[in-house]
Amino acid sequence: MRIFNTLTRKKEEFIPITPGEVKMYVCGPTVYNFFHIGNGRTFIVFDTIRRYLEYRGYEVKFVQNFTDIDDKMIKKANEEGTTVKEIGDKYIKEYYEDADKLQIERATVNPRATEYIEDIIDFVAQLIEKGYAYEVEGDVYFNTKKFNDYGKLSGQSIEDLQMGASNRTSSIADERKNDPMDFAIWKAQKPGEPAWKCPWGMGRPGWHIECSCMAKKILGDTIDIHAGGMDLTFPHHENEVAQSEALTGMRFANYWMHSAYVNINNQKMSKSLNNFFTARDILKEYDSDVVRFFMMSAHYRLQINFSKDLLDSAKASVERLYNAIGNLENLIDEVSRENISEEEVNYLNSLKKYREKYIEKMDDDFNTADALTVLFELTKDTNTNINVNSSKELVNKALNLIRELGAPLGLLQKITKGSLEDEIESLIQQRQDARKNKDFALSDKIRDDLKDRGIVLEDTPQGVRWKKIN
């Protein structure tokens, strides 16, 4: 398996620190609003990579944080007349709701920055003690000149970084720095802001130090993969490298991965430009398979343009794949022969080439676009060569292979009519029992869970009916 490493700017063989295990940290959302589909691409991309690593047999410890204290959250809390904690609680809940609908698997750990304040204070204190940070009137800055490798992740020269930092220097706070490139790792309290007691007075952590601290605390001094959106490469990830490696003297992450932007009219989708669609808005019109297919249709390091036309095209493609699955499921009920023939064994062995080709594509820096092509080749083959004269065993094995290759992409796992009917009927009965017992929370949960899997329930005078939705 080869991964493009932002740090070295080339594809490298993936060799985990511990054989068979992967320690992976992905920068998660700042929880002050619903996440937009550009953020969603990052979450879907690294969910897919995590799924594929598990498919290949790795045990993945997947950490994705919540930034629940920063300037945007303070501003939001002030606007809504509430607390930063309440804003965080609200939008973490909303994140899970949308992420679950996008079939994004829950992280092994979802740390909140505010849960690690004591660890962050200790991290900052050690950097000061080592001479990598200094305090000015309650603010603490990282001394970038002290860290000789500053700029190595983003590939920028010190001269370019200094020029850019000088151009940005305009405030009194900047003038107090030893160097324009220095960045805040602890911020003194301002009126009306939440703060914690520390050796430098009341204050709160800087954004960059939060991820460094949580990654170290949960995964250790050196991790296998650190990932996030391309826009985080500099300054966020660059600063993470500096402060983490300054503290430990060890390499922070062996592989750095970054997903490209989602664009609208050739501009990056962002809240600041007000040119975004929330994932929640999109999910009102398209289901998770369609959104994920759209994201997977381009390599994760290539920018992708967002449009309803492209989503409609993705929807048509997903329907083709589900039609192939539906054809096989219908055949299971139609074929009369149970056991596979010798000729069918040879054909089934020929289908294995699709698994091998799929793995070859995904092992090459997670090339999901080519992996989707393999899926279409497989379904075209089964549509052509499997029919009512085939054995039930062959039909089942072909069906399982399609679903197997869809799973790492988070695709093709929804129920289709004609399969798993017993499970649906059982859930409908559980829902009816819950309603009789006035357990409406359970009743609603069963209904919503089925809807997320592509099944809609209809309460009629004749009883409950169900149907598949696109």
UniProtKB/Swiss-Prot annotation:
Q: Where is this motif: 'KMSKS' region?
A: 268-272
Where is this protein primarily located? cytoplasm
Pfam hit, one? DALR_2
GO MF annotations in UniProt = ATP binding; cysteine-tRNA ligase activity; zinc ion binding
Q: Does the keyword Phosphoprotein apply?
A: no
The UniProt record gives the binding positions of Zn(2+) as: C27, C211, H236, E240
What biological process terms from GO does the record include?
A: cysteinyl-tRNA aminoacylation
Which EC number applies? 6.1.1.16
Protein location: Cytoplasm
UniProt keyword list:
Aminoacyl-tRNA synthetase, ATP-binding, Cytoplasm, Ligase, Metal-binding, Nucleotide-binding, Protein biosynthesis, Zinc
Gene Ontology cellular component terms for the protein in this record: cytosol
Name the family: Belongs to the class-I aminoacyl-tRNA synthetase family.
**Name of this protein:** Cysteine--tRNA ligase
Task: List the lineage, top down.
Answer: Bacteria, Bacillati, Bacillota, Clostridia, Eubacteriales
Gene encoding this chain? cysS
